[in-house]
């Protein structure tokens, strides 16, 4: 795994040796950023954006955002073994980029209450077969975590069911191998 573009282009991102963690593949990540850059369905300018990386794992998505000029990235991960690799990956950047790491269970009742607001981009990469995603989307909406024109991107297995929540719209959907990438926004 590597950083694809921007300030840290070409740098490697370490990943865990076990197979329980499935970091975002470079090709899928590159496709996501191409859509973010060129889509006519929404406008996101990564430069100076504020990004929330939920289930961040080793930080591949959030680090790519920092490399491409994001103003701030908040990484949220709950598993200690993966968290150690995330910290190492960020330290290896030797950068004064603005980022924060939060070790917390996202399903904690107070997680979204205590989180910053107005994220331009929220990335979700939950474990496959995760069935509590409605809690996350409701937390984001009820606590106004996403900015008015913000986008939520979710990485899922291609065979997983769509998430249907009133007021949540799928803007774009792409399949890459076994991965499904969904782009969401809340209806205004």
Language model features with spans:
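Class I S-adenosyl-L-methionine-dependent methyltransferase catalytic core
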Residues: 1-188
């Amino acid at each position: 795994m590597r950083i694809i573009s921007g300030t840290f282009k070409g740098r490697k991102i370490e990943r865990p040796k076990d197979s329980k963690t499935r970091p975002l593949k470079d090709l899928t990540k590159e496709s996501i950023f191409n859509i973010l850059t060129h889509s006519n369905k929404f406008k996101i300018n990564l430069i100076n954006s504020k990004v929330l990386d939920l289930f961040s794992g080793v930080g591949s998505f959030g680090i790519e955002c920092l490399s491409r000029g994001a103003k701030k990235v908040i990484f949220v991960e709950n598993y200690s073994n993966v968290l150690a690799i995330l910290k190492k990956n960020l330290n290896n950047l030797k950068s004064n980029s603005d980022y924060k790491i939060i070790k917390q269970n996202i399903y904690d009742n107070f997680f979204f209450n205590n989180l910053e607001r107005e994220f331009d981009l929220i990335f979700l990469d939950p474990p496959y077969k995760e069935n509590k995603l409605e809690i996350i989307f409701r937390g984001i909406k009820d606590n106004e975590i996403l900015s008015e024109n913000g986008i939520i991107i979710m990485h899922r297995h291609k065979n997983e069911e769509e998430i249907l929540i009133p007021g949540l719209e799928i803007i774009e959907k792409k399949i890459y191998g076994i991965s499904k990438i969904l782009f969401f926004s809340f209806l205004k």
